[in-house]
């Protein structure tokens, strides 16, 4: 993989694909983590004498939509990098090209949301060529988007000398440790809504791990597959056989699987709703399990004791609606308390929990990519990485 150390930026206009897909509310950025993570790469290039053109997406707009403008991101970036300014032009436009060509060394230009361009997600060759006119070299530092074969990730990388930024390098180094000779015992904690989102990563990691802890709504598909009564909890009915098969494979490989023993349940998902605790395999209708229960929190903390490598992706409950955030926070605390272990967390809600607890420094690596980290652990590479190796 070509890295920033292979690039002499002096006097060059460098096109950088960053991941500024951050939460924005009332025109203000709510969490600047991804902006801060991009700064080492940007400052390195500026110190080397480059001018920079930045590309990013925000949300999933269906074409130009002021709600998804990168203007608030430009404002937040400026607070950390005064050289930066936002230009409200789609990156494939003539205006964007003129703005880019007028840059002087030391200047930074953030262009409008790449997803305002109709060809972005189709990896349109013509759009990729228009992006390529914006710079003389390309740096991919958007790990959170590196699993998407889009024009601003893969298309343009084939048309310019392409390099991995520092964040990309850091992510690949940390996640590779989870695949190559991880220190044992190795525990994986998976949560979130769907088994189908995690099948690939479970299949890839099963031969490498010792313990698998499953929480979140995806646990109910496993519990029902084992004959449990799960009330109105979310279940992927078409994945029951697969869930059973995965449990059988885990047993054959000597992997200990931990499923919830009890759950916090309610009749509907809303803050302050009346909750009950039930055994995880005996949830009566009309209740649905919305978080792991107190016994499970203790059992999961015990299951993590002594682990030397831990990967965590996905919440243990409906994290965004208190009190169903408590299980996720408890798991975050249990992992952070491990001494001498290499711990990695990825995925929006899991990372949000770690940040809310103020425990980021206690983790070996906090990944900026949820889907990207899962795909990397499943396949050992990503579309965005493959073009940097070409």
Curated annotation (Swiss-Prot):
Binding-site residues, ATP: 198, 289, 320, 347-350
GO process terms (BP): gluconeogenesis; glycolytic process
Reaction equations catalysed: (2R)-3-phosphoglycerate + ATP = (2R)-3-phospho-glyceroyl phosphate + ADP
Aminoacyl-tRNA synthetase in keyword set: no
GO MF entries: ADP binding; ATP binding; phosphoglycerate kinase activity
Main location: cytoplasm
Keywords: ATP-binding, Cytoplasm, Glycolysis, Kinase, Nucleotide-binding, Transferase
Compartment(s) where it occurs, according to its Swiss-Prot or TrEMBL record: Cytoplasm
Pathway per the UniProt entry: Carbohydrate degradation; glycolysis; pyruvate from D-glyceraldehyde 3-phosphate: step 2/5
Key word ATP-binding present: yes
InterPro entries referenced in this protein's UniProt entry, alphabetically: Phosphoglycerate_kinase (IPR001576), Phosphoglycerate_kinase_CS (IPR015911), Phosphoglycerate_kinase_N (IPR015824), Phosphoglycerate_kinase_sf (IPR036043)
PROSITE patterns hit by this protein: PGLYCERATE_KINASE
Signal peptide coordinates: none
Pfam families per the UniProt record, alphabetical: PGK
Similarity comment text for this entry: Belongs to the phosphoglycerate kinase family.
PANTHER family: PHOSPHOGLYCERATE KINASE, PHOSPHOGLYCERATE KINASE 1, CHLOROPLASTIC-RELATED
Assembly description: Monomer.
Identification of the protein by name: Phosphoglycerate kinase
């Amino acid at each position: 993989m070509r890295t920033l150390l292979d690039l002499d930026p002096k006097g060059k206009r460098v096109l950088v694909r960053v991941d500024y897909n951050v939460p924005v509310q009332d025109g203000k950025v709510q969490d600047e983590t991804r902006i801060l993570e991009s700064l080492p790469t940007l400052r390195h290039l500026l110190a080397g004498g480059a001018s920079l053109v930045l590309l990013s997406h925000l949300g999933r707009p269906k074409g130009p939509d002021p709600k998804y403008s990168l203007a608030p991101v430009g404002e937040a970036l400026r607070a950390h990098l005064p050289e930066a300014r936002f230009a409200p032009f789609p990156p494939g436009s003539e205006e964007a090209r003129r703005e880019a060509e007028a840059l002087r060394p030391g200047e930074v230009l953030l262009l409008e949301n790449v997803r305002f361009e109709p060809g972005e997600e189709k990896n349109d060759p013509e759009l990729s060529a228009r992006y390529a006119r914006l710079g003389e070299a390309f740096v991919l530092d958007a790990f959170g988007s590196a699993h998407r074969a889009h024009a601003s990730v893969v298309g343009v990388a084939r048309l310019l000398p392409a390099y991995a930024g520092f964040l990309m390098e850091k992510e690949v180094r940390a996640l590779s440790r989870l695949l190559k000779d991880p220190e044992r015992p190795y525990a994986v904690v998976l949560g979130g809504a769907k088994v189908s989102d995690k099948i690939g990563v479970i299949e890839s990691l099963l031969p490498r791990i010792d313990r698998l802890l499953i929480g979140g709504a995806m646990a109910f598909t496993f519990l029902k597959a084992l004959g449990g009564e799960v009330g109105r909890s979310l279940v992927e009915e078409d994945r029951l056989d697969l869930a059973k098969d995965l449990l059988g494979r885990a047993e054959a490989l000597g992997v200990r699987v931990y499923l919830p023993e009890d759950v916090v349940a309610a009749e509907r998902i809303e803050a302050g709703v009346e909750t009950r605790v039930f055994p995880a395999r005996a949830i009566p209708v009309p209740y649905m399990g919305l978080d792991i229960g107190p016994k499970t929190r203790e059992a999961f903390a015990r299951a993590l004791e002594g682990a030397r490598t831990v990967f965590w992706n996905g919440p243990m409950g409906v994290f965004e609606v208190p009190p169903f955030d408590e299980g996720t926070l408890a798991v975050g605390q249990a992992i952070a308390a491990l001494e001498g272990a290499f711990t990695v967390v990825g995925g929006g809600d899991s990372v949000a929990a770690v940040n809310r607890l103020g425990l980021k420094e206690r983790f070996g690596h906090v990944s900026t990519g949820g889907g990207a980290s899962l795909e990397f652990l499943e396949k050992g590479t990503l579309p965005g990485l493959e073009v940097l190796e070409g």
